[in-house]
Amino acid sequence: FVHIKAIDDLGHDKNLDDRITMIENIDKIIGGTLKTLGETYRDMIVVVGGDHTTNIHIGDHSFEPVPFIVTRLEIYKALTNGEDISREALRDNVQAFNEIDCAKGVLGRFPGSEVMEFLKNIRQRIKQINSS
């Protein structure tokens, strides 16, 4: 679990340029970390989401659904290597990680209280696949 408060703070400050730069920098750091972990922890579940939205225009929490993405580390690694994963993953056509696009994905919208049970179910399914 990693919580990065700076993204929220920059939203409260209405500082769009620095917020974009911070998100891009974090994206690079997470990508590098996942590549390193991928050598050892291929079945690790990777989840990216937020605990709430902070609207840059009003500088306060806005209570829209947060974008949420989940994958196995092995699938992330295959994607970054340009491999075809069509047989390996439940995919959708979402091409951008934002509130509107992610809500249109296969996960749709769901309350945050369901996240842990959802992840437990994914973990159990991975164990079943690996044992067969």
Annotate the PLM regions:
Residues F1-S132:
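Feature captures the catalytic ectodomains and active-site-proximal regions of enzymes
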